[in-house]
Amino acid sequence: MLERYANEEMKALWNEQTKFETYLEVEKAVVRAWNKLGQIQDSDCEKICAKAAFNLERIKEIEKTTKHDLIAFTTCVAESLGEESRFFHYGITSSDCIDTAMALLMTKSLKLIQKGVKNLYETLKNRALEHKDTLMVGRSHGVFGEPITFGLVLALFADEIKRHLKALDLTMEFISVGAISGAMGNFAHAPLELEELACEFLGLKTANISNQVIQRDRYARLACDLALLASSCEKIAVNIRHLQRSEVYEVEEAFSTGQKGSSAMPHKRNPILSENITGLCRVIRSFTTPMLENVALWHERDMSHSSVERFALPDLFITSDFMLSRLNSVIKNLVVYPKNMLKNLALSGGLVFSQRVLLELPKKGLSREESYSIVQENAMKIWEVLQQGAFKNTDENLFLNALLNDERLKKYLSEDEIKACFDYNYYTKNVGAIFKRVFE
């Protein structure tokens, strides 16, 4: 975890102090459960819950000998207690404590992620509504296609982010699960009721079945969901980067007073935040393979998953949280240039209306193949003009004029009918209906 890419609230969940505090919370829940089952006296339960404490430095010191951080933890806590310490960590195994504590930490962390996703969705929605009717050219393969609105672009992003909210709700069900089932998961030394009570105290569900550990398909699902979320965020960031290119310049990341874009070129204003988000997304996705490989543990459990999770889980949550907040800020403060969008629309010389003309001809009795041939032939002439660099913004009617002078077209379409094809409103007439689908 790098401090540079961490928000304080999420970072506070993933440190040694919080980890052992959560272990202690689980251990106390187990003590309370034993007490409720009549196996530990009230006085011992009260003493443990009131007095149990640990010291990080002491845990590290003990671990030098034990080579086992959970045993170092329980030994340290026992030193803070009296005779009642005999009931601390009673009847359970290390993974009962560790995995149940991890469920608590992941649940809290995922709630922060969900909050970040909701914030991003609302920001995208608000900006989409703001630019619902802001005309721009749509591009496929990076090449001009047909007129759309910037609002549609943002609405598409918003709808995708909304799908992640649904997916994360399901993932929350999978990870908010504790297990207090003993060394082999067969409840040999503690009844099922102990697990049920302890998890109830902690606000967790119980796993239907476990072995020594909670099964890692749950963790892998989380990693994959966060990777998918990152890919969607990268998609937004990459599009912003393309739209900020100098020759496009339809949007721009906010550029603050005193900000610098280059140590050598004073004129530079770069989409550095979107580029940063793109890089963070690569890091997030990189954890999916080891987390998926953690699913296949030997028999009732081996240790191969532990080292992966010590890296992956903190970094997955911290980086995802930072990515979401940064992207939300980028979208919220994004500068949009509608005039440049209109200017770029005009740069096609009217070619963006080609399909409209194509669809009118078959209505007049011409075959689709011949219609396509006539329209494409005229379009290619305009491409040649564009390729030569002789085009001016005042030539946005190049394609229209070429069609009006084509004798073959005149047999099927009147001048007014051809001109009627060059209407931006035709391409935006369903924007309201689309927005209703997405946002209502």
UniProtKB/Swiss-Prot annotation:
Name of a matching Pfam family: Lyase_1
GO terms (BP aspect): 'de novo' AMP biosynthetic process; 'de novo' IMP biosynthetic process
Name by which UniProt lists this protein: Adenylosuccinate lyase
Superkingdom of source: Bacteria
Catalytic activity field: N(6)-(1,2-dicarboxyethyl)-AMP = fumarate + AMP; (2S)-2-[5-amino-1-(5-phospho-beta-D-ribosyl)imidazole-4-carboxamido]succinate = 5-amino-1-(5-phospho-beta-D-ribosyl)imidazole-4-carboxamide + fumarate
Enzyme class, first EC level, given as a word: lyase
CDD domains in the record: Adenylsuccinate_lyase_1
Annotated active site: H141, S262
Binding positions (N(6)-(1,2-dicarboxyethyl)-AMP): 4-5, 67-69, 93-94, 212, 263, 268-270, 276, 307-311
PANTHER family (UniProt xref): ADENYLOSUCCINATE LYASE (PTHR43172:SF1)
A single GO cellular-component term on record: cytosol
Assembly and binders: Homotetramer. Residues from neighboring subunits contribute catalytic and substrate-binding residues to each active site.
Family matches, as NCBIfam families: purB
Pathway the protein acts in: Purine metabolism; AMP biosynthesis via de novo pathway; AMP from IMP: step 2/2; Purine metabolism; IMP biosynthesis via de novo pathway; 5-amino-1-(5-phospho-D-ribosyl)imidazole-4-carboxamide from 5-amino-1-(5-phospho-D-ribosyl)imidazole-4-carboxylate: step 2/2
Gene Ontology molecular function, alphabetical: (S)-2-(5-amino-1-(5-phospho-D-ribosyl)imidazole-4-carboxamido) succinate lyase (fumarate-forming) activity; N6-(1,2-dicarboxyethyl)AMP AMP-lyase (fumarate-forming) activity
Keywords for this protein: Lyase, Purine biosynthesis
Keyword Lyase: yes
Keyword Heme: no
Family: Belongs to the lyase 1 family. Adenylosuccinate lyase subfamily.
Function (record text): Catalyzes two reactions in de novo purine nucleotide biosynthesis. Catalyzes the breakdown of 5-aminoimidazole- (N-succinylocarboxamide) ribotide (SAICAR or 2-[5-amino-1-(5-phospho-beta-D-ribosyl)imidazole-4-carboxamido]succinate) to 5-aminoimidazole-4-carboxamide ribotide (AICAR or 5-amino-1-(5-phospho-beta-D-ribosyl)imidazole-4-carboxamide) and fumarate, and of adenylosuccinate (ADS or N(6)-(1,2-dicarboxyethyl)-AMP) to adenosine monophosphate (AMP) and fumarate.
UniProt EC number: 4.3.2.2
